[in-house]
């Protein structure tokens, strides 16, 4: 199972910015929930796409960059800073975690200035 996430942080917590990012990007974000020690209002926005290992490859880097690049100036006007935008992949694997990325995709990501994080976690067989 793979969890592809686009995260956008912003300095002024509030639903106004959260809703503006949602409208601007045109995708449904993960619902915001207040955490025990977190702020009373959202200070980040995230979009999640889940795919299983049998699903066709989801090119999350290009898909997320296609969402962000044409809207970057508008995001910056909302108070988002480039450094607070990141893409992440969490991969739950059974036998091996092997990931590869296209060189052009990596160049594009590097030029964007957005962060990338990858977490791999082995799924434990609970059928024993």
Give residue spans per PLM region.
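Acidic (Asp/Glu-rich) sequence patches and key acidic residues
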Residues: 1-128
């Amino acid at each position: 199972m793979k969890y592809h996430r686009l995260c956008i942080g912003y300095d002024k917590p509030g639903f106004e910015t959260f809703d503006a990012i949602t409208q601007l990007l045109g995708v449904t974000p993960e619902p915001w929930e207040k955490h025990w020690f977190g702020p009373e209002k959202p200070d980040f926005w995230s979009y999640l796409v889940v795919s299983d290992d049998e699903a066709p490859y989801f090119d999350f880097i290009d898909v997320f960059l296609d969402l962000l690049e044409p809207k970057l100036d508008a995001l910056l006007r909302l108070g988002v800073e480039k450094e607070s935008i990141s893409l992440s992949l969490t991969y739950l694997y059974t036998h091996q975690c092997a990931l590869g990325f296209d060189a052009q995709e990596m160049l594009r990501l590097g030029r964007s200035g957005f962060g990338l994080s990858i977490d791999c976690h082995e799924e434990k067989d609970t059928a024993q």
